[in-house]
A protein has these predicted regions:
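Short alpha-helical hairpin
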Residues: 1-7
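A short glycine-/small-residue-rich loop at the edge of a beta-strand within enzyme catalytic domains
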Residues: 15, 19, 55-58, 62, ...
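His-Asp-centered metal-binding catalytic motifs of divalent-metal-dependent phosphohydrolases/nucleases
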Residues: 39-58, 63, 67, 88-97
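All-alpha amphipathic helical-bundle segments outside canonical DNA-binding/catalytic cores
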Residues: 83-87
Length: 144
């Protein structure tokens, strides 16, 4: 993922790709530990969740689905994961933009980590009511 980000020629987009992905990775790691979610799967979700948005500059409403397809292709090529593991990871990535819907524990962790990352990158960013709820719940879970 990061090797592909290094090829982004527009410097602000490259910086955003590195920064946001790293922040989601750190956030989901804490959430996975606190929520007893498999860390490896969580971190893969973090790495790929916005991949298509940064690498292909695709429209926001399509980035989650396209990112999940990239992830599926990558994981299948490694031959290190079972089909159900790949499906679980890719489902979470494909659904992470639907912050107002409740999904699998892995998907919920990714949604919450995405919101946490946005807040940590810019504490003055505008958050919707559901994003605020997610941020408060995520920080409470980490404090447990």
């Amino acid at each position: 993922v990061y090797s592909q980000y290094s090829k982004i020629s527009y410097e602000p987009l490259k910086t955003a790709a590195y920064t946001h992905t790293a922040m989601v990775d750190a956030s989901i790691t804490l959430l996975a530990i606190s929520r007893n979610i498999r860390i490896e799967r969580a971190k893969i979700c973090a790495l790929f969740h916005d991949y298509a948005q940064f690498v292909d500059n695709c429209p926001h409403d399509q980035h989650a689905k396209l990112s999940s397809l990239y992830c599926s292709q990558f994981l299948r090529q490694t031959e290190l994961f079972k089909i159900n593991e790949i499906d679980d990871i890719c489902y979470a990535i494909s659904r992470h933009s639907f912050k107002n819907k409740y999904d699998s524990p892995l998907c919920e962790a990714l949604k919450d980590a995405d919101v946490m990352a946005r807040f940590l990158e810019n504490p003055e960013c505008e958050l919707s009511d559901i994003e605020k709820q997610r941020l408060f719940k995520a920080t409470a879970d980490i404090q447990k």
